[in-house]
Amino acid sequence: MKTRESSVGLKFRKFNRFYTNVLGFLNEHIYDSPFSLTETRILFEIYNTPNCTAKALQDKLGLDRGYVSRIVKQFEKEDLIYKQRSKDDARHHYIFVTETGKTIYKKLEEKANEQVELMLKVINQKEQHKLAEAMAEIEAILSQSLSARASEISIRDYFLSEDLQLLIEKQRQFYAEAHGWDDTFLAYLQETFDADIEKIWIAESGGKFAGSVGLVKHDEKTVQLRWFLVDADFRGRGLGTQLLEHLVAYCQDMKFDRIFLWTVSTMAEARPLYKKFGFRISEVKQEAPLWGQQLTEERWDLELS
């Protein structure tokens, strides 16, 4: 079985090398343009995607954020594209192709179509049909694999500057929709995100936010658990447990003595999970007006030493 799998793998890589050469030929001789294949793909996606964003390009093409950013800036400098701030969310910018960009794109498309036709001209109709069917089958089979990979959840233990605004918005949205908290909670989030962040774990699936948890340094031996949230689309899959496992393991490795968190008594969903990991209530405040509700704050502690 192992030998057969290795044989398939070798054939797969051999085909990849062959098709990479075909793509290189297309890019060098067919498109006959100063753009690389990746640049051409990015221009194609911007042209054909309504309200395209840099994040959408990253997700669709599987490209690094910095790489996409450099190409977008280059295109902007060359007057191929322009950005427009979203009316709904000022943090987001949509990318559009300029008239110059449209002219260049259409020329690339025309040239590509002409030269692909010339490439196929030496292949008879029967073989062309077989080729098209084989391509469709390859696409269908590999799409299943890619779809399965995209549904997997990965957890990263670092954060980017734009992640902070995303976490604030996810927290605000969840507590507003599920618990009716008002905008004073948003103000609280924005103020406290300037705290001494020790670590943040962010769960993602197919480029989509799935959950998060973080730590804020309280003193040399104590950290506070913050920003614990699992997106509604990913609940019931054990993600909350995984996030807390990462957090507790990190705290043990760093030799912290204590983890604590503040929550409110109405947070029924997370309480069993906190108890499972050994957190215990250490302080309960009197019910008071908070974030547009009457809430009872609780402090939970986990002793590690």
From Swiss-Prot:
InterPro entries: Acyl_CoA_acyltransferase (IPR016181), GNAT_dom (IPR000182), HTH_MarR-typ (IPR000835), NAT_camello-type (IPR050769), WH-like_DNA-bd_sf (IPR036388), WH_DNA-bd_sf (IPR036390). Residues 1-140 form the HTH marR-type domain. Keywords: Acyltransferase, DNA-binding, Transcription, Transcription regulation, Transferase. CDD domains: NAT_SF (cd04301). Residues 153-303 form the N-acetyltransferase domain. GO terms for molecular function: DNA binding; DNA-binding transcription factor activity; N-acetyltransferase activity. It holds the Pfam family Acetyltransf_1. The keyword DNA-binding applies. The keyword Cell cycle does not apply. Signal peptide: none annotated. Residues 54-77 bind DNA. Its EC number is 2.3.1.-. It is an enzyme of class 2 (transferase). It comes from the Bacteria. Putative DNA-binding acetyltransferase. This is Putative HTH-type DNA-binding domain-containing acetyltransferase YbfA. It comes from Bacillus subtilis (strain 168). The gene is ybfA.
